[in-house]
Amino acid sequence: MQLLTIGINHHTAPVALRERVAFPLEQIKPALSTFKSVFLGHPAPNAPEAAILSTCNRTELYCATNDRAARDAAIRWMSDYHRIPADELAPHVYALPQSEAVRHAFRVASGLDSMVLGETQILGQMKNAVRTASEAGSLGTYLNQLFQRTFAVAKEVRGTTEIGAQSVSMAAAAVRLAQRIFEQVAQQRVLFIGAGEMIELCATHFAAQGPRELVVANRTAERGAKLAERFGGRAMPLADLPARMHEFDIIVSCTASTLPIIGLGAVERAVKARRHRPIFMVDLAVPRDIEPEVGKLKDVFLYTVDDLGAIVREGNASRQAAVAQAEAIIETRVQNFMQWLDARSIVPVIRHMHTQADALRRAEVERARKMLARGDDPDAVLDALSQALTNKLIHGPTSALNRANGADRDSLIDLMRGFYQHAPRSSDTSDR
């Protein structure tokens, strides 16, 4: 079985492409079914295992399959599923086989591949991806083991290194950018659109600045109100956004919508109503919540998740010692996992050996029963049974020895000596 990871991330593709390749949560299970259908007709042991990880910064397909053409098939499937021309997608896609796939999974879960070095959110996202794949019935022995090892490695890295210390989060970066536009965030009205984990983090950082007003707009009114109350703010219906957008100086949006919820026309009207006072907007969603054309307006300062990444990277350089320590841990764990994977590769051989040996045993036992039934001497029958089993079980190894030549024969003799502990060493044999 071969492990393979296919994906794009913030290192290889801009947000404009990442949002087109993203999988909304409700689409992941159906997508896994369509991916497995690519391999329809394969016998059950060869059917692929698969899991999809889709976040703001990456979309990745983890799979385990015996299909030699899996790499090309997976890339073609991703291209077809999202209706993106293959020649447009391919330059941004990475395909990582075997140990590279294992190393990548370990690095991602440990926060080493994140835009925010050492961030913990990705670990929860990966666990959710595994849970979804499990519910979809697309996990098996290999990916289950990979992800269990992945979570253990992430725990070890975070527990024994300072990889997450003093990190500049996306939320903190948003506040820093806002302070470049508005000298005092405390004098501004702030609107958060959405009520998920990222918005909660942003609200925490902005609330610490003591803004003039903090408002949360969310599709689920109850959840929005609960978040607003936590930070001493208030909630408003998302449907009121077009009519009230002009009231806010800072707007931070991160929803799970598959289409933009803030269009160019609505922002143009808001700017006009504000008499061209600036609006600072942060779009942390992938796919984006705010139409990119909004960024061209004169009095609007629009930043995406990629723009915030530049600020985040400034804080990453100071933790290179922790990175080196984490990479060393990961490399050791990759080797351990590959040893397990190599050991798994001989399981079918061992199973076949047991099946063959058991078939021989059954045949000889049946023959012995017939001999006893016709009145043959029991001692003679037992002797014949043992002789027949011995001859048939060593027939394969002795035939291989007789066919081998030169160095191959010497290696095979040493190998057989390991099987049969009391065999003489090859150097002690006078006649080969």
Curated annotation (Swiss-Prot):
Instruction: Identify the HAMAP family for this entry.
Output: Glu_tRNA_reductase (MF_00087)
Copy the domain comment.
Possesses an unusual extended V-shaped dimeric structure with each monomer consisting of three distinct domains arranged along a curved 'spinal' alpha-helix. The N-terminal catalytic domain specifically recognizes the glutamate moiety of the substrate. The second domain is the NADPH-binding domain, and the third C-terminal domain is responsible for dimerization.
Give the matching InterPro entries: 4pyrrol_synth_GluRdtase, 4pyrrol_synth_GluRdtase_dimer, 4pyrrol_synth_GluRdtase_N, GluRdtase_CS, GluRdtase_dimer_dom_sf, GluRdtase_N_sf, NAD(P)-bd_dom_sf, Shikm_DH/Glu-tRNA_Rdtase
One annotated GO molecular function is: NADP binding
User: Which domain of life does the protein's organism represent?
Assistant: Bacteria
N-terminal signal peptide: none
Gene Ontology biological-process entries: protoporphyrinogen IX biosynthetic process from glutamate
Q: Which reaction does it catalyse?
A: (S)-4-amino-5-oxopentanoate + tRNA(Glu) + NADP(+) = L-glutamyl-tRNA(Glu) + NADPH + H(+)
Question: Which pathway, metabolic or otherwise, does it act in?
Answer: Porphyrin-containing compound metabolism; protoporphyrin-IX biosynthesis; 5-aminolevulinate from L-glutamyl-tRNA(Glu): step 1/2
What organism does the record attribute this protein to? Answer: Burkholderia mallei (strain ATCC 23344)
Q: Which family does it belong to?
A: Belongs to the glutamyl-tRNA reductase family.
Q: How does it associate, per the subunit comment? A: Homodimer.
Q: What is its EC number?
A: 1.2.1.70
UniProt entry keywords in alphabetical sequence: NADP, Oxidoreductase, Porphyrin biosynthesis
Name recorded for this polypeptide: Glutamyl-tRNA reductase
Question: What function does the entry list?
Answer: Catalyzes the NADPH-dependent reduction of glutamyl-tRNA(Glu) to glutamate 1-semialdehyde (GSA).
Segments traversing the membrane: none
Q: Is-annotated flag, keyword Cell membrane?
A: no
Tell me which Pfam families the record gives: GlutR_dimer, GlutR_N, Shikimate_DH
Provide the residue positions that the database annotates as binding NADP(+): 194-199
**Keyword Oxidoreductase in record:** yes
What else does UniProt say about it?
During catalysis, the active site Cys acts as a nucleophile attacking the alpha-carbonyl group of tRNA-bound glutamate with the formation of a thioester intermediate between enzyme and glutamate, and the concomitant release of tRNA(Glu). The thioester intermediate is finally reduced by direct hydride transfer from NADPH, to form the product GSA.
Q: Where is the active site?
A: 56 (nucleophile)
Q: Where is this site: Important for activity?
A: 104
Name the positions where substrate binds.
55-58, 114, 119-121, 125
